[in-house]
A protein has these predicted regions:
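C-terminal anchoring/interaction modules
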Residues: 1-168
Length: 168
C-alpha cells in the first residue's frame, strides 16, 4: 500500500528479494491497470501520468522477475506480463501525446528553432524509454527462462536420486 503511494508520485521503489512477490503483484498490478484505464478514458493527464507509469512499470517488472522463480506464482506472472505489455503500449502512446504537447507549446512560444529542439528532446526521451523497456523485458524473459531451467534441473536431479536409491 505504502509502495503504491510512492509509485503514484512517480518515485522509483526498489524491490527487495525476500518480500512476498505474489502479494505485491496482487496489489500493484490492479493499480497499474486502473492508471492505464484512466489514461485511455482521458481522465488522467498524460504529462502527469508518464512518470507514474514508468515507475510502476519498472517496479512491477522487477517484482515479476523475482516472482518468476516460484512455480505457485506462474499464473500471476503470466497475467502480470500481459498487463506490462498494456503498460508499455500506454507509455509509448503517452510519450507521443507528450511530444505533441511539447511541439504545440514550442510553436506557440514561436520559432522553428524551438520546435526543432522540442522534437529532438522528445525523440531522445522516447528512445531512452523504449530502450529501458526493451532491456527490462529482456531481463524478465531471461529470469523466467533461468528459473524454469533451474526447476527442471532440480526435478531431474531428484528423479535421478530416486532411481539411484531404488536401484541400490
Amino acid at each position: 500500500f505504502f509502495e503504491n503511494q510512492q509509485l503514484q508520485q512517480g518515485q522509483n521503489v526498489p524491490v527487495i528479494a525476500n518480500e512476498l512477490h505474489g502479494v505485491h503483484l496482487e496489489i500493484h498490478v490492479p493499480a497499474l491497470a486502473q492508471l492505464i484505464e484512466a489514461l485511455n478514458t482521458g481522465e488522467a493527464d498524460p504529462m502527469q501520468v508518464l512518470p507514474v507509469l514508468q515507475a510502476m512499470y519498472q517496479h512491477i517488472s522487477d517484482t515479476a522477475q523475482l516472482a518468476a522463480g516460484d512455480p505457485a506464482l506462474e499464473a500471476e506472472v503470466a497475467q502480470t506480463k500481459q498487463v506490462l505489455q498494456f503498460a508499455e503500449e500506454a507509455i509509448n502512446n503517452t510519450m507521443k501525446a507528450v511530444q505533441k504537447l511539447q511541439r504545440d507549446q514550442a510553436e506557440m512560444e514561436g520559432g522553428e528553432e524551438g520546435v526543432a529542439m522540442a522534437e529532438q528532446d522528445a525523440k531522445m526521451q522516447e528512445h531512452e524509454i523504449k530502450m529501458q523497456i526493451a532491456q527490462e523485458k529482456a531481463e524478465l524473459d531471461m529470469a523466467i527462462k533461468q528459473k524454469k531451467h533451474e526447476q527442471e534441473m532440480a526435478i531431474r536431479d531428484a528423479k535421478a536420486a530416486l532411481e539411484f536409491r531404488e536401484n541400490s
